Amino acid sequence: MARFEEAENRLFNIKICLKCNARNPPTAKTCRKCGYKGLRYKAKEPRG
């Protein structure tokens, strides 16, 4: 997790396309690159 709330919002308040892994704005309904509707928020916790 980031040290500052502003940095955390900038880094993690993003949606990721499940099909092409493109970054999208948090208000997006579909992917900006491929048009896919399956979007998830970027993971806030590290894996592993």
UniProtKB/Swiss-Prot annotation:
Gene3D superfamilies registered for this protein in UniProt: 4.10.1060.50
GO terms of biological process kind: translation
GO molecular function: structural constituent of ribosome
Highest taxon in the source lineage: Archaea
InterPro entries: Ribosomal_eL40_arc, Ribosomal_eL40_dom, Ribosomal_eL40_sf, Ribosomal_zn-bd, Zinc_ribbon_dom
Record-stated family: Belongs to the eukaryotic ribosomal protein eL40 family.
Protein name: Large ribosomal subunit protein eL40
The organism of origin for this protein: Methanothermobacter thermautotrophicus (strain ATCC 29096 / DSM 1053 / JCM 10044 / NBRC 100330 / Delta H)
